[in-house]
């Protein structure tokens, strides 16, 4: 693993049954770098570096309490209108059954059946890597109010009407090296809530690039640019932040592993600066 891509990675031993020194109910904040979506950066929602907030149950509470807590936090603590929330659950396959239990938990919490969707492993199953702890997940989406892209518009279509805000993973399986699934010794809950995306929604912004983390850099780029290109401004701002966080954690540009990813981010950022016709020597003014 080149970078921490999810909050679960440091906790794998405890998901497998090892006792955590802080107990069975945890919360955490995790710096994450994901480069699988690097070519999507520049749109209204993708980031390479982001901060993930999570809460955990290590053999403690499971689906019903997890769903109830998530619904309460979103609607009561954050004040998100309940009618704006849609959810997805695992549709089931030959390996694991349909997750009707979680769907019923959502109905009990207050989500009507017409806003509960079922999808397969591509959308509602989580595993970090090819093997290890895994399980079905339930994702929470915010309806932005945009027009439907089609009659079949739903949270999985990617048109931008629905924005994912939280993901609860119910880790009750272990995928072995031979591709088989077996039950874990304990049932776990792993949740992940993207800080930047949630800030965007709570501040009434349309993209993460409008929140206070990015706005000063975005404004400076707009001041310096000679060519108006919103996607390039977003890429420069995002890759600058990502590169700085990697360097602060000890990363150095190179031709291999983590260093290559960092080098790639810097090169992409430099190309976009040139596209904006901004002198690359002015990058220090963006950092300050």
Describe each region flagged by the PLM:
Residues 1-263, 270-275:
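Alpha-helical segments
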Residues 288:
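Conserved small/polar residues in nucleotide/adenosyl-binding loops
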């Amino acid at each position: 693993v080149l970078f921490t891509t999810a909050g679960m990675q440091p906790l794998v031993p405890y998901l497998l049954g090892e006792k955590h020194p802080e107990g069975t109910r945890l919360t955490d904040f995790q710096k994450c770098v994901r480069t699988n979506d690097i070519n999507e950066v520049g749109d209204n929602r993708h980031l390479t570096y982001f901060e993930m907030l999570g809460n955990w149950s290590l053999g403690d509470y499971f689906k019903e309490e997890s769903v109830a807590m998530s619904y309460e936090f979103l609607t009561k603590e954050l004040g998100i209108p309940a009618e704006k929330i849609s959810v997805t659950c695992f549709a089931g396959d030959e390996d694991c059954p349909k997750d009707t239990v979680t769907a019923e938990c959502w109905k009990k919490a207050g989500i009507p059946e017409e806003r509960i969707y079922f999808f397969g492993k591509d959308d509602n199953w989580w595993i970090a890597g090819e093997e290890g702890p895994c399980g079905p997940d339930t994702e929470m989406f915010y309806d932005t109010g945009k027009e439907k892209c089609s009659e079949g518009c739903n949270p999985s279509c990617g048109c931008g009407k629905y924005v994912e805000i939280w993901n609860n993973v119910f880790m009750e399986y272990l995928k072995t090296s031979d591709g088989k699934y077996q039950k874990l010794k304990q049932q776990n809950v792993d949740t992940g809530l993207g800080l930047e995306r949630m800030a965007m929604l709570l501040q009434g912004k349309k993209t993460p690039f409008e929140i206070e983390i990015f706005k000063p850099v975005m404004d400076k780029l707009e001041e310096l640019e000679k060519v108006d290109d919103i996607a390039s401004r977003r890429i420069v701002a995002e890759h600058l932040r990502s590169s700085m966080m990697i360097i602060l954690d000890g990363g150095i540009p190179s031709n291999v592993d983590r260093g290559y990813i960092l080098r790639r981010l810097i090169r992409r950022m430099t190309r976009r600066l040139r596209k904006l016709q901004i002198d690359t020597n002015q990058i220090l003014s963006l950092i300050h």
